[in-house]
Amino acid sequence: TPTGSTGYSLSCNGPVISPNSKNFIITPIAPHNLNARPMVIPDDTFIELEVDSREKSFLISLDSRITSVPKDTKIYIEKSPFTIKSIIPANQSFLTTLRTKLLWGEDTRNGSNI
């Protein structure tokens, strides 16, 4: 989602997504293939995952919870019908926050701005 997972996505070379965009980001974590790239898809997309494996089961990890799942299991992902309301101070904006946290436009050579 655009809100709350930007840092995780960035740490895996994923994109920055504006909070008002209605998208999901699928970002591979430590891919073994250089062709595995992040993907941005509409948030009304219904995602179905199916693992093709020679093993009898596989591990799935969601929000620090790990469980073993039989190999014929299908995983479905869709947007929740619930939303959250957030408070944004009048003197803050998404782009200003990014610029500050990611040091955009700053000259960080030789520790001059640290």
Language-model features: locations:
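Catalytic phosphate-donor-binding core of small-molecule kinases
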Residues: T6-I114
